[in-house]
A protein has these predicted regions:
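Long, low-complexity, compositionally biased intrinsically disordered regions
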Residues: 1-143
Length: 143
């Protein structure tokens, strides 16, 4: 199990451009935050999208979520974007920080051969939104 802070730190190993992109090019809508009684966790959920990428305009919206699964701030993260699916989902699943929802469950041999448990820019944007909305502190612990 991993904390959100640890996952975001691991993401920095892929380069700082993810943090810059999350701040400037990722947009959010339909933000929801609250307990999920059947699963005994607190979930943050929103739709995210990138307004522009290197290849041009992208209009796809992605379902992005962060589940706080215990009082020690361990999380499960998820995003339906291709970067998360084919780079991070398997590695996070190996650490207990994600379920296999969107990928095929195979190891990302080319995109993430070291199996670094990081996240996409959409998850980083949702984490920033949690801090700005006062739901978590700067270390991503629930308030």
């Amino acid at each position: 199990m991993l904390t959100l802070k640890k996952i975001i730190r691991n993401t920095a190993r892929f380069g700082h451009e993810r943090f810059d992109l999350a701040g400037h090019q990722v947009r959010t809508s339909s933000f929801k935050f609250g307990p999920v009684k059947k699963e005994r966790l607190v979930r943050a959920l929103c739709k995210t999208w990138s307004e522009k990428t290197e290849a041009g305009w992208v209009r796809s919206k992605y379902a992005t979520s962060i589940d706080f699964i215990d009082p020690k701030s361990h999380v499960r993260v998820s995003c339906s974007c291709p970067d998360f699916c084919f780079r991070f989902e398997y590695a996070l699943h190996q650490q207990g920080a994600a379920n296999i929802h969107f990928s095929n469950g195979e190891s990302p041999g080319v995109r993430n051969p070291s199996l670094i448990a990081g996240c996409c820019k959409h998850v980083i944007k949702l984490a920033d939104l949690l801090v700005s909305q006062g739901k978590t502190d700067r270390n991503f612990n629930l308030l």
